[in-house]
UniProtKB/Swiss-Prot annotation:
Catalytic activity: UMP + diphosphate = 5-phospho-alpha-D-ribose 1-diphosphate + uracil
Binding, 5-phospho-alpha-D-ribose 1-diphosphate: R79, R104, D131, P132, M133, L134, A135, T136, G137, N138, S139, D200
Single GO molecular function: magnesium ion binding
Iron listed as a keyword: no
Keywords from the UniProt entry: Allosteric enzyme, Glycosyltransferase, GTP-binding, Magnesium, Nucleotide-binding, Transferase
SUPFAM superfamilies named among the record's database cross-references: PRTase-like
EC number(s) on file: 2.4.2.9
Annotated protein name in UniProt: Uracil phosphoribosyltransferase
Top-level taxonomy: Bacteria, Pseudomonadati, Pseudomonadota, Betaproteobacteria, Burkholderiales
GO process terms (BP): UMP salvage; uracil salvage
Role: Catalyzes the conversion of uracil and 5-phospho-alpha-D-ribose 1-diphosphate (PRPP) to UMP and diphosphate.
Amino acid sequence: MSTLHLIDHPLVQHKLTLMRRKEASTNSFRRMLGELSTLMAYEITRDMPLQDIEIETPLETMTGKVIDGKKLVLVSILRAGNGFLDGMLNVVPGARIGHIGLYRDPETLQPVEYYFKMPSEMEERDVLVVDPMLATGNSAAAAVARLKQLNPKSIKFMCLLAAPEGVATMQKAHPDVDIYTAAVDRQLDAHGYILPGLGDAGDRIFGTK
């Protein structure tokens, strides 16, 4: 069974509460999402492998540590996942970026893929899939299944909010993929939105309706 990691740092919880407010502007919502993704990135990357290298300081030679292996790949589930990227890149500026375009059929709530573009050498890379909301879990599960066809070294999933239903879907479909979230909310409504949630993350990031 995959592990659910709740990132409950006080700054994360503070900013998340401010983002949830219906009166939060597009600008403030977008800014706080970037700040949150930076904070969450520290937790998610704490187990990245390291290797020793010899370097010269201004005073002497020493052995230091750097991230081992190929660059991390951040995979955004379009379009809302893009809101995470700038904040994540503050922490891992050398990361490669992939995109998966999925939309949720309003009748079946099942994902339909319309775009898929990844960096090269995926089999040598660790992957972090990002999407602000883990609602039904169908889109996240479909994205991970598609990525597994490329045989990456590992896959993690990061979201801002999760519903219990979405967590259950992901854990059943992909028990090997850890989930990182700032909160697990109460439930989904009849339309597949998270309650109490924060509304449609994509609309709030981009100022659309």
